[in-house]
Swiss-Prot record:
Superkingdom field: Viruses
Name by which UniProt lists this protein: Protein 4
Amino acid sequence: MPCCVIKGYASANQIVEGQVLKEGCRVRFMWDQKGISWGMSLSPEGGLSFRLVPERHVQSYLKRLMITVGDDQSSFVTMTSECRISMFLFKVSISVGTLPDVVVPVERLEKLSI
């Protein structure tokens, strides 16, 4: 699968913009605790919009972030990364290549700065 890069900023109930370098790539973010997942959609211009969809408020730290990336023709690649996320805004920077396991840095921010 060709390499793609996704970057964005998010907090609960906030929609932010990111960008994907491979057109048609589908990305899924899933938390394995607290029943929280990410929803996303590709714009006609190729941009990526994603939104945090919590079943309940994010009140405690999450232990692991799982990201699945692929398109309709390719197998999905799943990556995991230990992370600590609270109600503060946080930065997500994802770099996806052909490696079976890629570390995904999740950096906590005190305020949103684009």
